[in-house]
Amino acid sequence: MRNLLPALLLLAAASARGAETAAFLDIGVGARGIGMGGAYTALADDSSAVYWNPAGLARAEKREVAVSHAELGAGTREDFLAYAHPISRGTVAAALTYLSQGAISGRDATGRPTGDFQASDAAFAGAYGLKTEYADLGASVKYLRSHIASSEAQGVAADVGARRAFDGAGPGKLVVGAAVRNMGPGLKYDTQRNDLPLRVAGGAAYSFSSGRTLAFEVQTAPRGGGADAGFGGEFKVMEGALLRLGWSTKSAAPAGSGFDAARGLTVGLGLERAGFLFDYAAQAAGELGAAHRFTLGKRF
């Protein structure tokens, strides 16, 4: 039963939004953004912006490669690989997201075991962030592939985003951003086609000269209704070392899960040295315990 929990929770999240599929597209990637409660649409300026907001790629000054691994509980794992390459008027990037749920116990309509089956999802993305005079713009195209037992579905999706920074806004810098994620015709398993988790997100982040950053974000689901909010902070504790704290309504643990006192709480750590970046984040995951994410990157 425990191996079935990740699938049930993903399906429940999709059901709450309506008949959606490919729920893995709404989980989030990278330890920095998750450590800040998912309030990253405005702040994203690294290779993980391929997921959060492709406009955040626009002003990358160096090439970056990053790999991220997440243990989401009960054998469910998420891996993310991205590469960003600055060009004359912006940055191009490519990324792969892969979610594996391992072996899941199958049962028929009467509850009798039918043997284990596998489930996995993948998204291959190409993105471009463009610098303009007034705002940075970005777009990405994704090829999607989903596999559940003997059923398989393929499809395409697209994201668009915008981002603008206001230097000299008081003692620091203000950044605002917005993105529309997972636009597309959905995925078709056998004869039924389900919608992708279309999301519209907008937020703001303020970075102080002291090294502190505060961020806020709201995300809506136009098809199924409902909204989520995220708050996060990043604090410089010494040169090259950052602590992060966040809270998200989307990642809040369900009541009675044993994690009520920490519902929605995320914590993280960031280290940077000689162009290498290491980030870690943890978030409450209800009955699955705590989800852990690790990201290793290199800028050159």
Predicted segments, located by residue:
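Single transmembrane alpha-helix segments in multi-pass membrane proteins
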Residues: 32-58
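Hydrophobic h-region of N-terminal signal peptides that target proteins for export
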Residues: 8-18
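Short helix-onset patch at the extreme N-terminus, typifying the N->h transition
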Residues: 6-8, 24
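Outer-membrane beta-barrel porins/channels
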Residues: 18-37, 41, 62, 70, ...
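Positively charged n-region of N-terminal signal peptides that target proteins for export
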Residues: 1-4
